[in-house]
Amino acid sequence: EMSDRLIDVVFPQLQFDEPADNKGLLIVGNYGSGKSHLMSVISAVAERDELSVGLTNPKVADAASQIAGRFKVMRTEIGATTMSLRDIVVAVLEENLAKLGVDYSFPSTSEVVNNKGSLEAMMAAFQQRYPDHGLLLVVDELLDYLRTRRDQELILDLNFLREVGEVCRDLKFRFIAGVQQALFDDSRFAFVADSIRRVRDRFEQVLIARRDVKFVVAERLLRKTMDQQHKIREYLTPFAKFYGNMNERMDEF
């Protein structure tokens, strides 16, 4: 399932060679689901062309070629902070742009009517130095952060998030955020339903499938030899009678 979502959603949304209605991406997965690792893989391939050959699924590797090495990537994880989402994003962008040799400073919040113009000006400065590259911003733990925000603060954060999603359509700027559950279905945000709906229009959600997590654990993290499987079976068999259908599912265990 995850390979299909990468091929059909993630890579097409990130690419900028073909005109498209590009949107921001939300990677949805609970703690331990591999959400952060998936974002790391996507952003690493986007940053370094040679890494795409390390993707074991041939179809995914082929589809990844449209973004491989095409981006300068900026990464951050939101922790305990009272900063607005705009201030967080602006701080990360300005710090990393300086490292890339791009001189750009965002105006203060009190000086802008909307943020799209500032993002467009930033990308114009970026493209002067890197005309063949896009800019990818990866933000983890977005949902936990939004849950800490007060009513008015949250509305401003969501409006900024919508603007970020909107500029992805016309610029070589891309945005990926990691959330623990589907942002648009979170009952805690029911009071800002209209703002959530407008954000939904400019973002694609990519859910990490449970069967893919199971496959990665079995085939990548904890792959076992036949001898190891035999020893585990011998150890577990005496306990099977205490756990429902464990006997029938022994191969999975």
PLM ranges: what are they?
Residues 45-48, 166-169, 190-200:
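Short, surface-exposed basic-aromatic patches at helix termini and helix-loop junctions that form
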Residues 186-253:
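Amphipathic alpha-helical segments of the small helical/lid subdomains adjacent to P-loop NTPase cores
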Residues 100-104, 128-129, 168-170, 228, ...:
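Hydrophobic/aromatic interaction determinants used to assemble and anchor large protein complexes
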Residues 136-140, 166, 172-181, 185:
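Structural recognition of the conserved hydrophobic beta-strand(s) that form the central parallel beta-sheet
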Residues 43, 177, 253:
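Segments forming glycine/polar-rich beta-alpha architectures that bind adenosine-containing cofactors
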Residues 21-139, 143-159, 186, 195:
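P-loop NTPase nucleotide-binding core
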Residues 1-18:
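N-terminal pre-Walker A segment at the start of P-loop NTPase domains
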Residues 121-129, 156-175, 199-202:
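Substrate-engagement module of ASCE P-loop NTPases
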